[in-house]
């Protein structure tokens, strides 16, 4: 993480996970994502109110995350999102490096546009491995409601990613924000292609109907919400897939891969019919 940004966040008052979940629980929330350079993030977040608190786990202000994403050989999960299909799904494993906990997660969106995320605990050794047995059956049960349950048998690990996350509780407990840094990814479908973005910061705010103090600080700094996905955007950069949804983000933060595909050392993947 950028040293200045790390210092800004580390100087905030701390909060534990149980208290964070209790105070920031919201039945309805609006999520906004922002992508910006670390220098800009440091300048903006230096104006956080003093009442802002940062999550500490085992004395650590920054928690490491590792994710593995699953898709079919024809990239059906990716394409459903990239082409803005109303019904879609995403499958991944997520591991929390500070605690050693791992989960299998399924995120679905149904015909009414409501996104639902379900997860089940798995062992550390299972994270990122091919789906099998009851794990695959569990995923199939969650994906079935989207109408794409028939794709689950073809799911395989396609992308591994890691990053560090700081989680903020905003004043009054009216929302939270996450700050992701040290982002890196490795393709599991080619020759181990890697994409790293050490100077990129992704901030996601989670608030009620009213924008949070972090949203207002970002807007005042000239930073607006963007479309970005740690899975979709990177797969588009690596493999030059249809990506209208993320074109602006690709052009600004992954332009070297977009303009020079040989950097990725990977050929375009086959498209679903």
List PLM regions with ranges.
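Phosphate-end processing signature that detects enzymes handling 5′-triphosphorylated RNA
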Residues: 1-273
């Amino acid at each position: 993480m950028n040293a200045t940004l790390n210092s800004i966040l580390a100087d905030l008052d701390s909060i534990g996970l149980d208290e964070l979940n209790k105070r920031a629980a919201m039945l309805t929330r609006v999520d906004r994502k922002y992508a910006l350079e670390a220098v800009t993030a440091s300048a903006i977040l230096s104006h956080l109110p003093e009442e802002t608190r940062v999550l500490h786990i085992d004395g650590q202000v920054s928690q490491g995350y590792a994710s593995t994403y699953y898709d079919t050989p024809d990239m059906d999960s990716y394409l459903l999102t990239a082409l803005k299909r109303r019904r879609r799904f995403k499958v991944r494993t997520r591991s929390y490096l500070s605690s050693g906990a791992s989960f299998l997660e399924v995120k679905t969106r149904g015909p009414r546009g409501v996104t639902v995320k379900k997860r089940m605990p798995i062992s550390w050794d299972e994270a990122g491995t091919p789906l099998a047995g009851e794990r695959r059956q569990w995923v199939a049960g969650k994906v079935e409601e989207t109408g794409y349950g028939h794709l689950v048998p073809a799911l395989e690990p396609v992308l591994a990613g890691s990053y560090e996350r700081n989680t903020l509780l905003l004043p009054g407990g009216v929302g939270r924000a996450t700050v992701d840094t040290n982002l890196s990814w490795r393709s599991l479908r080619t020759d181990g292609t890697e994409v790293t973005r050490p100077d990129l910061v992704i901030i996601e705010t989670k608030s009620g109907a009213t924008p949070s103090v972090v949203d207002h600080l970002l807007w005042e700094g000239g930073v607006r919400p963007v479309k970005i996905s740690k899975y979709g955007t990177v797969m588009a950069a690596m493999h030059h897939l249809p990506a209208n949804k993320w074109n602006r983000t690709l052009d600004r933060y992954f332009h070297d891969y977009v303009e020079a595909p040989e950097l990725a050392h990977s050929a375009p993947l086959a498209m679903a019919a």
